[in-house]
A protein has these predicted regions:
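Short, hinge-like loop/turn segments at secondary-structure boundaries
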Residues: 50-54, 131, 160-161
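N-terminal beta1-alpha1 ligand-phosphate binding loop
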Residues: 2-29
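Glycine-rich phosphate/pyrophosphate-binding loop and the adjoining helix
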Residues: 140-205
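Helix-loop-strand module that forms the ligand-binding subsite of alpha/beta enzymes
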Residues: 55-146
Length: 205
């Protein structure tokens, strides 16, 4: 079993440290992890060209397609981001928009979790923003004893956020349990049946 972890910070600071805290718990539960830094280089946004409908992947062959292959094989995904203006890192959002729109493999029952790190505020807005990618993709969202937030400005300051780090450890433990439970359920019952063709309703016609 494996969890793909995306570090949405251009630095290995508090967001990266938050993911590391979770990775230790995953390892203790026998789950492999991979932390991928996604904001170190510019990531273009979606151009709405529709080419992915034919190709099955984004026409811009960059980190998005590389991460799509990793997600395809993973049992879970953690997205971590610093907070910029009560939102996630812009490069991360560009990546996620293209990743979830262009990758057409079934993400049903891959477990998701979002982590937001800030100096002071904006974490819950960012947390909600990131969770939207999971809830539109049939991915159960793991929860903890509190919202998955960490606090610190300078690299390493999150070490002083005892409650935040504990929340992340509980999150990883709960996510481990959920991943294992879903694996057993899939083995015994299979995935939920889907209707043959998705329905699309426009609000203007």
């Amino acid at each position: 079993m494996k969890v793909l972890m995306l570090n949405g910070s251009p630095r290995k600071g508090n967001t990266y440290r938050a993911l590391e805290e979770m990775a230790k718990v995953f390892a203790a539960n026998g789950i492999e992890t991979e932390i991928v830094d996604v904001a170190k280089e510019p990531i273009r946004g979606c151009q709405a060209c529709g080419a992915c409908g034919k190709l099955g992947k984004c026409v811009f062959d960059d980190q998005v397609n590389e991460i799509a292959e990793k997600l395809k094989e993973a049992d879970g995904m953690v997205i971590g981001s610093p907070v910029y203006y009560a939102s996630a890192n812009g490069a991360l959002i560009s990546l996620l928009d293209r990743l979830f729109y262009s990758s057409h493999f079934d993400k049903t029952m891959k477990v998701g979790a979002a982590v937001a790190v800030a100096r002071r505020s904006g974490t819950t807005a960012t947390f909600d923003e990131l969770n939207k990618y999971f809830t539109i993709s049939g991915m159960p969202v793991a929860s903890s004893r509190y919202w998955n937030n960490g606090y610190g400005r300078a690299a390493g300051e999150i070490e002083q956020d005892a409650e935040g780090l504990q929340t992340l450890r509980v999150l990883a433990a709960n996510m481990s349990f959920l991943i294992k439970s879903i694996a057993l359920g899939k083995e015994k019952y299979g995935l939920p049946e889907k209707e043959e063709k998705p329905a699309f309703t426009s609000f203007i016609r």
